[in-house]
């Protein structure tokens, strides 16, 4: 299942806030705890990849 919804994230390479569609989203949680969802994004300006937190209601996709 591909990710489709854009998410507003801060690009750490440029420092700007951009709206991007994540390449992949996965759950990151310690044992027995709720955890957070992390998304893999590609910076449109520099081409570097970075990870950022996505909303909890975002579906897990790869």
From Swiss-Prot:
One GO cellular component, as annotated: cytoplasm
Coiled-coil features, chain-numbered ranges: none
Pfam families referenced in this protein's UniProt entry, alphabetically: Cren7
Keyword Secreted listed: no
Described purpose of this protein according to its UniProt entry: A chromatin protein, binds double-stranded DNA without sequence specificity. Constrains negative DNA supercoils.
Subunit and partners: Monomer.
Protein name: Chromatin protein Cren7 1
Source species: Hyperthermus butylicus (strain DSM 5456 / JCM 9403 / PLM1-5)
């Amino acid at each position: 299942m591909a990710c489709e919804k854009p998410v507003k994230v801060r690009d750490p390479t440029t420092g700007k806030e951009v709206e991007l569609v994540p390449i992949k989203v996965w759950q990151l949680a310690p044992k027995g705890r709720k955890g957070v969802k992390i998304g893999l994004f590609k910076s449109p300006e520099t081409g570097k990849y970075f990870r950022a937190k996505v909303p909890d209601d975002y579906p897990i996709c790869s």
